[in-house]
Amino acid sequence: MDIIENHDAWVETYTQNWLAHYNETGETKWDLYNRPNNKTAPSGKAIDLKQAKLVMISSAGAYLPDSQEAYDAENDLGDYTIRLIPNGTAYDKIAYAHTHYDHTAVNMDTQVLIPTGHLRDLVEAGEIGSLTDDFISFMGYQPNAAQVAEETVPAIIEASKAQGATGALLVPS
């Protein structure tokens, strides 16, 4: 299944409209942006969460400032890289480089976007089998959907498989 249905047509529209306007003016004009609209929702077979090894994937732009480079949050064209963060990391060691959402809630309670404590509680209660060693974060502001499909998604899949994940929890920002 294609990540973006009609991939080439989407790239052509993106390049000729939103990106061309941005390159000419330096302005992000969102009424020119054609969001991908798939007709088929991806799915797979159901999993038993009590037996699953779950990876959490967050678009919060989380990173470890003491050891990882921040995302390029000011780049109008986005940052398509990922960061792996150990699940046991203290919340005060995590920072957020993402300027495209209101940080009020996450500043008050990190678990609204990084619910690792709640997930560990569910593992302890036997509701989830286990968690991967690391969770995955990326900066959700990524206007080039083709680049997401060609770079970000494969990197997330590779990192998830390397940790033996059998299921994923997606946490949008």
PLM features: residue spans?
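Metallocofactor- and cofactor-centric catalytic cores in central/energy metabolism, strongly enriched
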Residues: 1-173
